[in-house]
């Protein structure tokens, strides 16, 4: 069986360095808020081209804390609206409602699955205060246009970069476009820890200072609490492991991009919709880092069964949109036909930096041999 993502083989590439990092942390006797965290925050800031990185416990906390910090600064308040695409993973919406804000779920661009600038503009009201573009599946959103729109309407922009590590437009990385960004380092991400981890990036010094406190019980100095904060700290061990893996992110990105190109050039089945036209991709390679390679078909269950029978593991990202989840039942009557069509048709096939040429060819052959009997 070709695994959807072989985390063991990915991390085995760096096992000596990862084990050295573990030993270094163990021997240091300092396990929370130490030099490993400082080093990773510094290196990740350099990687993203930003002034500040704030390590936190996970990607959801990253988004939640940015919105919370803007509330502390008086830039937003409970009841304000946040525009987000309706086909996102539920964490994007959870961060909004956790802060007493109102998610405005808008239809995505049917071709990119990302926020449509036209749909953002149509959704703006007097209560709109934030745009939350999710760079879904590894493709960065149309950030120059989104930032121009945000500037025109005086809106804040919070990038959800949980799936877009290393993506860029004109050399400017995801995480350096909006007023702030949230990253996840969940093990399956393109830059994955060996446990839960996350980070916030920003160029706003005032925002960063509040976030440094909010993640640590609302405190800059022990036992002096400025805010009603939380415990959301990126620990020393995960920071050390991430520092190792960050060095290789660029190479892994190129490998993913090469696999994606092989898929785009060679999967040819009228029953399967590919995520991009190959020429479109070749002209904008840096914009997609292929966290996921998501195809679409009206016959998803049959295709998934066919691929399984051919020894290929697949996953669905995502089977149920947020507005159809029980947690958000009050939104279930929303008319979002594009979103619902996407969730009914998408299927993710294997793409990972340790895939062999034989495995790639097998996936292509299996996709091309799919037929409706």
Residue spans for each PLM region:
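PLP-dependent aminotransferase class I/II
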Residues: 8, 37-42, 47-54, 60, ...
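Hydrophobic/aromatic ligand-binding patch that stacks against planar heteroaromatic rings
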Residues: 95-96, 149, 173, 190, ...
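Conserved active-site segment immediately N-terminal to the catalytic lysine
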Residues: 159-194, 209, 221-226
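N-terminal "arm"/small-domain region of PLP-dependent enzymes with the aminotransferase-like
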Residues: 1-30, 310
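Short beta-strand-to-turn element immediately C-terminal to the catalytic PLP-Schiff-base lysine
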Residues: 183-184, 198-203, 243
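Phosphate-binding glycine-rich loop
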Residues: 30, 34-81, 95-99, 105, ...
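Pyridoxal 5′-phosphate
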Residues: 13, 76, 256
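PLP-dependent aminotransferase-like
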Residues: 71-136, 140-161, 168
């Amino acid at each position: 069986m070709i695994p959807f993502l072989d985390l063991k083989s990915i991390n085995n590439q760096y096992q000596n360095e990862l084990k050295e990092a573990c030993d270094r942390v163990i021997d240091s006797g300092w396990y929370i808020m130490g030099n490993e965290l400082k080093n990773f925050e510094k290196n990740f800031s350099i990687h993203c081209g930003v002034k500040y990185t704030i390590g936190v416990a996970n990607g959801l906390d990253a988004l939640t804390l940015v919105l919370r910090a803007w509330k502390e600064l008086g830039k937003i308040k409970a009841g304000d609206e946040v525009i987000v695409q309706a086909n996102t993973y539920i964490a994007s919406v959870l961060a909004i409602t956790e802060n007493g804000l109102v998610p405005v779920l808008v239809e995505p661009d049917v071709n990119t699955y990302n926020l449509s600038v036209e749909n953002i503009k149509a959704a703006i009201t007097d209560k709109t205060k934030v745009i939350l573009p999710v760079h879904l599946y590894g493709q960065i959103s149309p950030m120059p246009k989104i930032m121009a729109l945000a500037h025109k309407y005086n809106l804040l922009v919070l990038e959800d970069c949980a799936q877009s590590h290393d993506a860029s437009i004109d050399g400017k990385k995801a995480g350096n476009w909006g007023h702030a960004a949230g990253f996840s380092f969940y093990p399956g991400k393109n830059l994955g820890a060996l446990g839960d981890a996350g980070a916030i990036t920003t160029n706003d010094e005032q925002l960063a200072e509040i976030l440094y406190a909010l993640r640590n019980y609302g405190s800059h100095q022990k036992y002096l609490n400025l805010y009603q904060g939380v415990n959301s700290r990126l620990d020393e061990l995960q920071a050390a492991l991430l520092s190792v893996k960050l060095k290789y992110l660029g190479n892994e990105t190129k490998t993913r991009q090469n696999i994606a190109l092989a898929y785009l050039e060679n999967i040819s089945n009228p029953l399967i919709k590919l995520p991009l036209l190959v020429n479109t991709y070749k002209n904008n390679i840096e914009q997609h880092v292929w966290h996921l390679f998501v195809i679409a078909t009206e016959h998803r269950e049959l295709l998934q069964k066919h691929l399984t029978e051919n020894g290929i593991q697949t996953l669905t990202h995502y089977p149920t949109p947020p507005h159809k989840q029980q947690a958000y039942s009050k939104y279930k009557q929303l008319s979002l036909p594009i979103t619902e069509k996407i969730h009914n048709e998408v299927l993710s096939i294997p793409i990972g930096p340790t895939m062999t040429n034989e495995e790639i060819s097998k996936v292509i052959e299996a996709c091309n041999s799919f037929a409706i009997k």
